[in-house]
Each structure stands twice: as structure tokens, then as C-alpha cells.
Design a protein with these regions (language model features):
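Terminal, low-structured helical/coil segments at or just beyond the last alpha-helical repeat
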Residues: 281, 285-328
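N-terminal leader/linker segments that initiate helical-solenoid repeat arrays
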Residues: 28, 33-75
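Amphipathic alpha-helical segments of tetratricopeptide repeats
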Residues: 56-57, 97-102, 138-140, 178-183, ...
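Conserved alpha-helical positions within TPR/SEL1-like repeat arrays
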Residues: 71-82, 108-123, 149-163, 190-205, ...
Length: 328
């Protein structure tokens, strides 16, 4: 787990990456940040968020340089976004950008803030502003000569185009990002994995299921090696591979994969609204597979979870914002 003291002493943010869930389940960032194949639990995420909330109270000029304060607010936005607290994430990102535009301007950090804001807009269904932010982040990185950061912009643009069902554009940018990440020894593992999943999802959108399945199988092997068999990324890979088999017409191969994937996601993601949409797809699959009793049990679980989540105003509002259906 990242040490908060490292941020204070070295003035660096150690992870500003998007969630794999955002990539593959159309806008549900969840399950915690990942760094070097280590996953933060919900408790870890809450604890780190609390630390950064405390730090943000004094993260203003003249108490510290604007760029340092901006990085603290930027990372706080990432933590809020990973927890699904979208409104607070937007406020944190916008405040970070105000700080980061104070001279001397840090172009890499400002581009990161724009990039993160773009992913947040995409998660909440604001695709027009998302595309505007992502393209501006890409232009800023190109103008500043930040070649190592360009693949991340391609990756996030691919994700956005996936939301918009522009599968050809998504495939082009995902392929470009995947090739760049595969050649970069310092690329974060979640970026390597995420681009494979975006690439596979774009192929699913255009009904090229054999090609999608091949990429998902590669992603599953990578996920198992990086994270282990019981962690959220592996559960998501497993579920998506099952989904691709289902849509290709192979319900026999799909069944155990979707069941296992949903079980893993239930253990690692069950606290988050995103899990409702996993269950919804699984219930629909069970209906198609003529497993009516099993489907009914899942549908009852969905109703119970939705009732519980709707009883919490912030989460209930978030459920209305999440636009996961675009992938399915």
C-alpha cells in the first residue's frame, strides 16, 4: 500500500490510473486502486481517503507550493472516483486544476487532471464533456512532448469510444495503446490489462467474438499472473470471457465462466453499485440458458441490493447516473 508520507516528502503521486472496472463495465470504477498488482480493499480505500481529506485541508497556497497542493487534490479525486463518490471527485479534480494552473504550471499534472476528469465524465454518462477533456489532455501531452503518457490518453479515448459504440475508433486506439504498453517495461499492469479488455470489448461490439475471446483469454492469463485467481481483475476477466462466449452462441462454455466471475466479483465488488449490473447480466444469461430458478434467485438478490442502495441518497443518485448498458 502506498505510504502517505512518500507524497508529503517527495511531492509525487504514485498512481493516477483509471479503474479496470471503468474500462470494461462501462463506467463503474470500483474495488480500489491498483498499484504494481496490489489491490486496495474497501477498508484500505476508506483509510487512504481519510488521510488525503485531512491533507487537503492545508493543501493551499501559501502553506505549500500550488503544484504540490494540486497533486494532493488530484489524488483525492482519484480516491473519490474509485469509491464511486462522483460529485466529490469532480469537485476535487476541478480544484486541483485551479491549483495546477498557477505558475509555474506543471503540464504533466494538469494533463493528468484533465484526463481523470474525462474518465469521471464518462462514468457519469456525460460523454460530450468527457471527449472534450480527453482530447485536451492528449493535445497537452503531445505539445509538452510527454511521449510516455500518450498511451494512457489513447487508452482512455478508446474507453470513451466504447461508451459511444464507436467500436472502430475504440479498437484503433485500444490497439495502439496495447502495443505501446506491451513495449514499456514501466507500464502499470492495470493499463496493460485494461487495454486488452477494451480491445476485446470493442470486438464484441462489432460481433467479432472469436477475436474478442482470444484477447480475453490472454487478459485472463495476465490477470491470474498479476493478481491471482480470486481478485477483482481476474473475476472481471472471467465474467467478460463468459459473456463473449455467451454472445458467440456457446452457452456451455459461458456458464461456468460467468458463474465463477460473478462469484469472485460478489466477494470483491459486492459493496459497490456496479455489482448490480454484473448480476443483471448474469440473470439474463441464466434466462437464456433456461435456468429459470437460478435466474429468479439472482433477480431477487438484485431487488434486495437495489432497495438497500436506493435507501442511501448519494448511492441512489449514483445508480441513476451509471450507464453500464452501453456494453451489453
Amino acid at each position: 500500500m502506498r505510504a502517505f508520507s512518500m507524497l508529503c516528502s517527495k511531492f509525487v503521486i504514485l498512481s493516477r490510473s483509471s479503474s479496470i472496472i471503468l474500462t470494461c463495465l462501462a463506467a463503474c470504477s470500483a474495488g480500489g486502486l491498483r498499484l504494481n498488482a496490489q489491490i486496495l480493499t474497501q477498508e484500505d480505500l476508506q483509510n487512504e481517503t481519510a488521510e488525503y481529506e485531512v491533507a487537503s485541508r492545508s493543501a493551499e497556497p501559501p502553506h505549500m507550493p500550488p503544484v504540490v497542493a494540486g497533486r494532493i487534490w488530484l489524488h483525492l479525486g482519484v480516491l473519490y472516483q474509485d469509491a464511486g463518490r462522483f460529485g466529490q471527485a469532480e469537485i476535487a479534480y476541478e480544484h486541483a486544476m485551479r491549483l495546477l494552473t498557477i505558475a509555474p504550471v506543471s503540464r504533466p499534472d494538469l494533463a493528468d487532471a484533465l484526463d481523470n476528469l474525462g474518465t469521471l465524465y464518462a462514468e457519469s454518462g456525460n460523454l460530450k464533456d468527457a471527449e472534450h477533456a480527453e482530447k485536451n489532455a492528449l493535445k497537452m501531452r503531445e505539445a509538452a512532448g510527454l511521449k510516455s503518457e500518450l498511451p494512457r490518453s489513447w487508452y482512455h479515448l478508446a474507453t470513451l469510444y466504447l461508451h459511444q459504440h464507436r467500436s472502430a475508433n475504440a479498437r484503433e486506439f485500444a490497439q495502439r495503446a496495447a502495443e505501446a504498453f506491451s513495449e514499456d517495461r514501466n507500464a502499470l499492469p492495470e493499463n496493460k490489462l485494461g487495454t486488452l479488455l477494451v480491445l476485446a470489448s470493442s470486438l464484441c461490439q462489432s460481433h467479432q467474438y472469436p477475436e474478442a475471446i482470444a484477447h480475453l483469454q490472454s487478459a485472463l492469463q495476465l490477470s491470474n499472473n498479476l493478481y491471482g485467481p480470486e481478485q477483482l481483475p481476474t473475476g472481471l476477466n472471467t465474467f467478460l470471457l463468459g459473456y463473449a462466449y455467451w454472445k458467440s452462441g456457446d452457452l456451455v462454455s459461458a456458464n461456468p465462466l460467468m458463474q465463477r466471475g460473478s462469484d469472485i466479483l460478489g466477494k470483491t465488488l459486492g459493496w459497490h453499485p456496479a455489482y448490480l449490473f454484473v448480476l443483471t447480466q448474469y440473470a439474463q444469461f441464466l434466462r437464456k440458458a433456461h435456468q429459470q430458478d437460478a435466474a429468479h434467485a439472482i433477480e431477487q438478490e438484485i431487488k434486495q441490493k437495489r432497495t438497500h442502495l436506493n435507501s442511501e441518497p448519494k448511492i441512489g443518485q449514483q445508480l441513476q447516473m451509471i450507464d453500464i448498458a452501453v456494453l451489453f
